[in-house]
UniProtKB/Swiss-Prot annotation:
Protein name: UDP-N-acetylmuramoylalanine--D-glutamate ligase
Pathway connected to this protein: Cell wall biogenesis; peptidoglycan biosynthesis
GO function term, MF aspect, one: UDP-N-acetylmuramoylalanine-D-glutamate ligase activity
Enzyme class: ligase
Similarity comment text for this entry: Belongs to the MurCDEF family.
Keyword line: ATP-binding, Cell cycle, Cell division, Cell shape, Cell wall biogenesis/degradation, Cytoplasm, Ligase, Nucleotide-binding, Peptidoglycan synthesis
GO BP term, example: cell division
SUPFAM superfamilies found in the cross-reference section: MurCD N-terminal domain, MurD-like peptide ligases, catalytic domain, MurD-like peptide ligases, peptide-binding domain
GO cellular component: cytoplasm
């Protein structure tokens, strides 16, 4: 969608719905292009009021506590250039349907950014789990090799902030993490140079209704990409091998039947192999878990496609620091390791994390339950966990699932994370525990704003109760 220049006879107003990070930067970027911008936000609080003041100084009108209702547009329909919606608003929202019926264009922040950034080489990364790690890892590899390769999108920096900030800079690669919510609204717009699909499992079905719809949305990004990289270890992607657009495939499997379909794999000597040639030794890298080996292979495959040598990739990876809240070791001694995996927001990501642990951990889980199969999660709990501590909205449901799976060891229920940590402290003192794993397996929205806040609070509680000096990304007072 070209962003039109204003004239007397053209519609003038861009309505931005939602004042989160993407809405803020969409409004700011559009205003920098000389557009008239009005922002609507359904909530109202001190933080939003401060954001409103910032935008109003730029001559952007901001309305807080304003609901996204079609009737609110009735007096200005003829003045609307486009409505830019938050990723949180589904495209089948009744107001969106009515706006489209009136011929009004409905866009996402990604659409707006694409128009200014489409001449840059994009790497579009999507997947149910793993996309943030691959995005961060690949950007690190490229930036360490003196390529200007910011990461943005669903992680960290909104794409419109990149568009706003880089007018005089020459970006080599834009590494964009793209969620299904973002792809859904911009599906025919974004055309990456390289598309990467990390994993696919049941998630966000409250939004996308069916697994097939969710799959098609993810796949649309890969269809639009010039080159594609897939994870053969993922059962859904593997089962669709023949129907998916041609691309590069990676696997951690050692089965010859799998290797026949793949370009990158791990051999018996722990070497990363690229089409029959040893590329790098896996022993150089410290990411925990098979799922992170998959992430590593996806990033390496992309870096090789871009043209980086194995030596340059190796040197970059040696300086890589893992993102917080993803199998993050926050404390380790010769007796105890404490791991924060707050990003494990569904059964599949939690299962992958538990599998990565050696020995029998005690596990803390709980939060707001999401859709998806729990069978493998229950099985790995039953096989490996020494004890389970549950909290939050889903605690009773999770306990029922675990007990039905045959779990015979200790299982406890608490109201919140603070209560859990208080009890876990004494439990560890009285039992031989080598690993404490915080692996919620649920979203955070019953008690926290997001998984980052949940992970930070977990670290803070551990720090205070255990009186430990943590390997933390932030200091706690």
């Amino acid at each position: 969608m070209p962003i039109k220049n204003n004239s007397k006879n053209e519609k003038k107003i861009y309505f931005v719905i939602g004042l989160g990070r993407s809405g803020f930067w969409a409004a700011k970027y559009l205003r920098s292009l000389g557009k008239k911008v009005i922002v609507w936000e359904s909530n109202e609080n001190e933080e939003l009021s401060e954001t409103k003041e910032i935008l109003e100084k730029l001559d952007i009108s901001v309305c807080l506590n304003k609901q996204f209702l079609f009737e609110e547009f009735s007096e200005c329909l003829n003045q609307i250039e486009a409505v830019v919606i938050s990723p949180a608003i589904p495209i089948d929202h009744k107001t969106i349907i009515k706006l489209k019926e009136k011929g009004i264009e409905v866009l996402g922040e990604v659409n707006i950014a694409w128009e200014s950034l489409k001449n840059i080489n994009w790497i579009g990364i999507t997947g149910t789990n793993g996309k943030t790690t691959v995005t961060h890892l690949l950007s690190h590899i490229l930036r360490t090799n003196n390529l200007l390769a910011p990461f943005a999108g669903n992680i960290g920096t909104p794409l419109c902030k990149i568009a706003y900030s880089i007018k005089s800079k020459n970006i080599d690669w834009l590494v964009a993490e793209l969620s299904s919510y973002q792809i859904e609204i911009a599906t025919l717009c974004i055309k990456p140079k390289i598309g990467i699909w990390t994993t696919f499992t049941a998630d966000h079905l409250d939004r996308h209704k069916t697994l097939d719809n969710y799959f098609k949305i993810k796949n649309s990004l890969l269809k639009q990409s010039e080159f594609r990289i897939y994870n053969y270890d993922d059962i859904h992607l593997r089962e669709n091998f023949k129907s998916l657009s041609k691309g590069i495939w990676i696997t951690t499997s050692s089965k010859q039947s799998d290797l026949d379909h793949c370009d990158y794999w791990i051999n018996n000597e722990d070497f990363i192999v690229e089409r029959q040639e040893n590329l790098l030794s896996l022993k150089n890298f410290k990411l925990k878990g098979n799922h992170n080996t998959q992430n590593l292979l996806l990033a390496i495959a992309a870096a090789r496609k871009i043209g980086l040598s194995p030596e340059k990739i190796k040197n970059a990876l040696l300086s890589y620091e893992q993102l917080p809240h993803r199998m993050e070791t926050i404390y380790q001694s010769n007796k105890l390791e404490i791991i924060n995996d707050s990003k494990a927001t569904n059964f599949d990501s939690s299962t992958a994390g538990i599998k990565a642990i050696k020995g029998a951990p005690i596990i803390i889980s709980g939060g707001k339950l999401k859709s998806g199969s729990y069978i493998e999660w229950v099985n790995i709990i039953n096989k490996k966990a020494k004890a389970v501590f549950l909290f939050g909205e889903s605690s009773q449901t999770l306990k029922k699932l675990i007990l039905e799976g045959g779990f015979k060891k200790d299982i406890f229920i608490f109201n919140d994370l603070s209560e859990v940590i208080n009890y876990v402290y004494s439990y560890i003192e009285n039992n031989q525990i080598e690993t404490l794993l915080f692996s919620p397996s649920c979203s955070s929205f019953d008690q926290f704003r997001n998984y980052e806040e949940r992970g930070d609070i977990f670290k803070k509680l551990i720090h205070e109760k255990f009186n430990l000096k943590l390997f933390a990304h932030k200091e706690f007072s």
